[in-house]
């Protein structure tokens, strides 16, 4: 599940928090929380989801949030009975009007935690901000609301608090509300959210058994909107059950300038790993997501900027892993590289039987890109 980053920008006048909104937009934040009179100003800055503190349906925000200036933030005393809470009544009324509703609660003590658990059952989002706590109330609320259709957004001040919130009780909050003016903190927190919940892949050594030129064919070059570094590339193979880590063109070469956004991935028939699924290389197009993987198995999402399919001389590479042979067909050129067991790129022109390269092997078959349990032989 993707984790989301909200930027809190409701204090002071517009110019005081415009910069943090702009930084959030540029860094890839998902939502901005502002006062109701600033919704349109945010929309003028860029395309981002807007949440607004309000008690009516006139703001035009994507998400209306109750609690500021009410019981949620402690401005007004809590009602002895949550059912009689003005925030609760307002949230229900706005939901009945078909709006997406959030509740904002500052957890000052146990009673506020209990109030948050109750109002959360009536809302689409529950935004909780701590005073002197780190984990326990969040754990309690995740447990209390696990059967409710509400997304918990935890207030944080930096990337370390964000990481803690997003990983609490394995599931973590669905997102965080960041309250910071520091551009570096905003960027680092967005990066934490992008990595959160994405498990490392287990890459293993595969022993090369064959390297053979196979003639001319069509190969796919994937130019992404992302800069890759040494050790990064994409998992590509002729079988979905076993894929080679094909290195990006991030290394300098005497033959051509580096292209750190590019992976010369393989022939048109090949599979490429995208999240938990696979796709054919030849299906990729601008705007599609791909998975960038490094030699240690860490994953991140990339965006396809362009795909080039061109006729080139090809080379078959086979490797043995777990007693099985896996294959890939790559362009026969010095700049096309796999990754050795030390995380170093190795050119297919230098590849020989007996070399060990990093591969991803899981066995099993695929049906429309999804893993299924069935007997299948791919040669």
Curated annotation (Swiss-Prot):
Catalysed conversion reaction: 2-amino-2,3,7-trideoxy-D-lyxo-hept-6-ulosonate + NAD(+) + H2O = 3-dehydroquinate + NH4(+) + NADH + H(+)
Superkingdom assignment: Archaea
Source organism of this protein record: Methanococcoides burtonii (strain DSM 6242 / NBRC 107633 / OCM 468 / ACE-M)
NCBIfam families listed in its UniProt record: PRK02290.1-4 (NF002626)
Function: Catalyzes the oxidative deamination and cyclization of 2-amino-3,7-dideoxy-D-threo-hept-6-ulosonic acid (ADH) to yield 3-dehydroquinate (DHQ), which is fed into the canonical shikimic pathway of aromatic amino acid biosynthesis.
Keyword terms of this UniProt record: Amino-acid biosynthesis, Aromatic amino acid biosynthesis, NAD, Oxidoreductase
GO function term, MF aspect, one: 3-dehydroquinate synthase activity
Family matches, as HAMAP family: Arch_DHQ_synthase
Encoding gene per record: aroB'
Signal peptide (residue range): none
Enzyme class, spelled out: oxidoreductase
InterPro entries in the cross-refs: DHQ_synth (IPR002812)
Name listed for the protein in its UniProt record: 3-dehydroquinate synthase
Keyword Amino-acid biosynthesis in annotation: yes
Family from the record: Belongs to the archaeal-type DHQ synthase family.
GO BP annotation list: amino acid biosynthetic process; aromatic amino acid family biosynthetic process
EC number(s) per entry: 1.4.1.24
